[in-house]
Amino acid sequence: MAAKSNPAVIDEPLARAVADFRLALISRHLDDREITLRNQSKVFFQISGAGHEALGLGLARSLRPAYDWFFPYYRDRALALALGVTPTEMLLQAVGAADDPASGGRQMPCHWGQRELNLVSQTSCTGSQCLPAIGSAEASHYISRRPHLHGCHAHGDELTYVSLGEGACSEGEFWESLNTAARLHLPVLFVVADNGYAISVRASDQSPAPIHEMVRGFRGLQVVHVDGRDYFKVRAKGADAIAHIRIGAGPVLFHATVTRPYAHSLSDDQKKYRPADELEDEEQHDPIELWARQLIRRGALHRDDVDRIRDETFAEVRAAAEVALGSPRPDPRSVLDHVVAVPDFEDPGEPVVVPDAEVVTFGEAIRRTLHEQMAIDERIRVFGEDVADADPTVLDEVAGKGGVFGITFGLQRAFGQARCFNTPLAEANIVGRGVGMALRGLKPCAEIQFFDYIWPAMQQLTQEAATTRWRSNGSFTCPLVVRVAIGGYLTGGSIWHSHSGESIFAHVPGILIAFPSRARDAAGLLRTAFACNDPVLFLEHKHLYRQGYNRDPIPPLDWRLPFGRGVHVTRGDRATVVTWGATVHRCKQAVGELAAETSTDVGIEIIDLRTIAPWDRDIVADSVRRTGRLLIVHEDTLTCGFGAEIAAFAADACFEYLAAPVWRLGAPDTLVGYEPSLEDATLPQVVDIVRDLRALLAY
């Protein structure tokens, strides 16, 4: 039997191992305490990190809290403790307390996030944290070379830690993140915790081999496999892997086999799908028991010491639970706090136009505004498919591309490859990396080439970007601008280059949506978009890029348009038309045709909303209460188009003023065809607007 330990003579690595062993016991006691509280209906969900303790704590010794950046997943409880999250703070989240520092009671347990620790607020989406982690690592490179950037901090040798279960390796976003990390030589530690299951799905049912075998030979990626149940092995291999990253040698995938002695969560019963002998084997290979035996064998502890530490940590967790249970719960009214923060400033009115000022197209106004804003703010980076001019090695020999519509032409040449660059053809990659950059204080401007191809980025837009402020209770923000070419009227655009769908994103809390129709508004709204600290979907109608009718002089630099403020295109007192995007001009044409027929002012008021989220309810209500009639015109399909929301609002807020039913004109529930007559039959035409206005006025 080993002699009783004498802390004074234990060497430093063993002393650290004892301290970490204490944290491992705290982690396990927290799981057990939450399970007890869940069974007592005092917490409402429980998911454990049991079996993963040695992995998290073995790595933590080489990681640096509040220095490195962390994108953990829900089994990283032991790591979070090592980084500085306290047992009380974890239990505050479990009970849903107002003082929960991660989310103020908004998120499930084990969804940590503390800005002061660089511990990024996480979502429940498996694997979706990988792409923001890549963006964070990119930001480290960028910021460390520009230490003067306001609100941005980097040390030069920090790394980004991102973890996931083996099951999440089936997600495409994981593979996209590996590809980019390896190609860009980024300082990322990918930790894959393999407990053999994704809830009830065996790893062998998902992949032909463990992930460390599948990526062996992946160029630019070091691959490490370790027994994650053994703290000392993890600590040794982890130290080497992390040192590899810190010296700039590139990313590491760290694959660790671990156990899952408890079910996936308390909503699961693993005895339904795991045989008894398998669970017995896991119990025999419990990392905490192995750790205790190793410490005893090395003379760091005696069995009595292990029992004493177990009792002490149990009492510590029990006391923390009492504090959490006695903490106040959130005020239900606070559920509307921290959804989004719209910059608040006065409508600037008409811009002052310099005599003989150059008049530019809608597309050129956007291009020049991007150039202007990039010159002002070095935090802005523009990236996406084909946005760069050309490969730097041939830039002096060619004219340059600058986007399929030329909107980013010249930005790379003016500001360099670090600030305007091409990405893989992967929309989730584009947006997800932007999320990570934004979390680090940069002002990323991502481009989605066509709205029709935005769908692979839906999870990053709606779950990672849009929820950032709310899920962290205001601790984190995501100042990301996503420019998207949208809409039809192209003649030949066909199905996948012609559609709109702004109403889908209007349904997502946390996203701001701009949809300008003329050059000056595009400039004013884009300036405001860069001033926002929340994600902005900046919709640019392709048909409007080079038209003559919506050209304007570039407004003065200080001319910014507030979101949520529409504008009167025409004035009238007989009917109101609400519209946006490319249908604004078609509505003007329709009113012009009606006026030409009668040689009089037909009294129709056209309102251009300019932004969809938020949208200007006041201007609509004021107009409809004066005119008594409302027609809403949009390019999107009629069913569930954004016009339905406006119609519902008008019926509610203006019912007693209405002299006729609210009318809507949009695309039928079909797709845009290639042959021009098919497109004309789908998208609202001037003749359709004239027809509906006549009927509305005659009602």
Could you describe each region identified by the protein language model?
Residues 55-56, 129-133, 169-177, 199-200, ...:
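Short glycine/serine/threonine-rich phosphate/pyrophosphate-binding segments
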